[in-house]
Swiss-Prot record:
It catalyses: succinyl-CoA + acetyl-CoA = 3-oxoadipyl-CoA + CoA. The active site is at residues 90, 357, 387. GO terms for biological process: 3,4-dihydroxybenzoate catabolic process; phenylacetate catabolic process. Pathway: Aromatic compound metabolism; phenylacetate degradation. Coiled coil: none annotated. Its EC number is 2.3.1.174. It comes from the Bacteria. One of its GO terms (molecular function) is 3-oxoadipyl-CoA thiolase activity. This is Beta-ketoadipyl-CoA thiolase. Gene3D superfamilies: 3.40.47.10.
Amino acid sequence: MREAFICDGIRTPIGRYGGALSGVRADDLAAIPLRELLVRNPRLDAECIDDVILGCANQAGEDNRNVARMATLLAGLPQSVSGTTINRLCGSGLDALGFAARAIKAGDGDLLIAGGVESMSRAPFVMGKATSAFSRQAEMFDTTIGWRFVNPLMAQQFGTDSMPETAENVAELLKISREDQDSFALRSQQRTAKAQSSGILAEEIVPVVLKNKKGVVTEIQHDEHLRPETTLEQLRGLKAPFRANGVITAGNASGVNDGAAALIIASEQMAAAQGLTPRARIVAMATAGVEPRLMGLGPVPATRRVLERAGLSIHDMDVIELNEAFAAQALGVLRELGLPDDAPHVNPNGGAIALGHPLGMSGARLALAASHELHRRNGRYALCTMCIGVGQGIAMILERV
């Protein structure tokens, strides 16, 4: 069987909501790592790229009408290189890698770029058309995150719990305490801060160069969402606004962020022809559905499914990158999979609670981080897994090359 390999990857820093990257359109943001991949790999013939596949969860504003194609052109790739945008909400970036890997395994391509982008700062307000003449029922939605234009049957049959409310549901179901969640969040901040100060995160990042109207140039080099001075006392003091006697706070949840990532996926033969060095083999990927109100547990069945496909167990994984949408759901996943809350090989360099969660980009970031960490640890297998809004999970296994 033909195999698909991650040969290189890069990402932008992750910006805070309204922060350093908020002035950058999503298509321009996605073009940055695409362009950098060509710079980093001068022997790569861009004419040989079969497709560019990017995940993006919003697509309601400047990221509309196939942002992958827009970014491909803006990055200076040949017009002959096609691009497509996929949407599996939070799992979009990881799903993009899966699409690329399947294309190679099926013989439908040899060289692809896959990744994701999200500019949550620039997500627009949207309003639907009137359903009748002179209607006064117009409703406006903030597209940054959450439900919009809800189907009444969906609301009736499955509810429309917000993302924090789904985390509350998981915490209540599995009896995950506020104390355990805050401790998990603190570890995320501490591990991320250590990874940033040691230069580990910098290995993944291409700086973003910005110029203001006065011509002043600023270079954004580092992720800006993390709070390295966070203490347990500070986390304990935050209010839980989503439910009476709730446990979900701004401190034990991921952020609303901006960022983009791109990875080169190639067959073994094409990698050799293009002077690329395979770093990780994409072994298998799986998705699974769960009850929408418990969407945070989606990684559990997805992980079990991908492990079965690969003929492996959770204990074969040397690195696990689990997206931290909320501490409650991350802990729920760990406990359901039989892993300790503070497993050192799970998010060893922190996670989304500290780094942030630009929806369409996050899955690609997980795969990039996992491929780097496998080489640092001389490990063999890595698992990347995420929960997905409306009740899904996605999981991918990588093998170090």
